Amino acid sequence: MKKIEHIGIAVKNLQTSNLLFASLFGKEPYKTEIVESEGVSTSFFQVGPNKIELLQGIAKENPISKFIDKKGEGIHHIAFEVDNIYHE
């Protein structure tokens, strides 16, 4: 493993969470996108060398809404940067 690429946080309301995190970090997200294949909307914040991804489920059936229904809002995943995903 080279480093943590980003930490993904599942949220119920991306717009509200963007406002909260922008207030905490003193900056707006540098990227927002809809990932149709997963049924989610995301925002990314750069915090020093680290990235935080906020994810909200937008489709009827999606992994983020299922996660929140079971566990509530919070850390959903940690993504690592590697040289070779099949070797690590």
Language-model segments: residues:
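A short, acidic/glycine-rich surface segment
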Residues: 30-31, 61-66
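Short, charge-rich binding segments
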Residues: 44, 68-71
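Core segments of cupin and vicinal oxygen chelate
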Residues: 1-2, 9-51, 88
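Short, low-complexity, polar/charged sequence segments that are solvent-exposed and flexible
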Residues: 49-51, 64, 71-75
